[in-house]
Amino acid sequence: MEKLSVYMITKNEEKRLERSLEAVSKVADEIVIVDNGSTDKTEEIAKKFNAVFVYNTWKSFSAQKRYAQNLCANKWVLNVDSDEVLSDDLIKEINRLKENFTKNAYKLRVKDMYPGWKKPRLLSRTYNIVRLYHRDYMDMPDDYSNDRPVALKKNVTVGNLKAPVLHYSYIDLTQRIDKWNRYSSEFMKTAKGKKKKYSSLRLAMEFPFQFLRYYFVRRYIFCGFYGLVESMTAAYFRFVKIAKFREEEIFEREKINAEKR
């Protein structure tokens, strides 16, 4: 049977971490947690599950994930967030796979969960993303994010797991807005490094386009109140991240002009 390392990154996750670790401990031979300076009980909870708990200064989302992955002792790794819970059926599915992995990587079905939900809503959004993989067959890109998968090498075989991961990303609206704001700032830095360009037309159209995309294409329309709120806030911060990028361009030009004076 193959050994499996589970890795995650944290900061002040005492409200959600224990439920996540209770689930992953049923499949993991090793749990690695990289923390960015928690001041709550995150470390105490992690150590209840004998996790390797390491502090690392935050540079970017992808850098933190890569650092955690590279600390893993095993070749087979599972990338889980602290707000995600493996379903009972997925735990069984992964444990069966550990006896004989037939692919190089596997996509997990992630289902969003919101306050008051006992189970995922029918027709609500499900997204498939590579989270379980053999480290020899992938690269961690610099712009890695939860909705952008790891970069698989050529001729890699990918399987699909059937049972879901339950994603409890939403605590309350304040937490959600704070999270989106951090993500938009991170995007701005990544886009700046890639020398991207965004037009005024793109900026103007971003909010309405993204709202329609989230609400209808991503099926948040089936998530009731939280689906509407999530679509509005996500679309707004998609607009904000481009606005932050354009603002940074203005600041850079002002700095250059000031130096020329």
Feature locations, PLM:
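A conserved acidic beta->alpha catalytic loop
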Residues: 23, 35-44, 58, 81
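Short, structured coil segments at secondary-structure junctions
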Residues: 27, 49-50, 128, 154
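Conserved donor nucleotide-binding strand/loop of the catalytic core
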Residues: 29, 43-71
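Catalytic-site signature of metal-activated, phosphate-bearing donor transferases
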Residues: 63-69, 80, 87-251
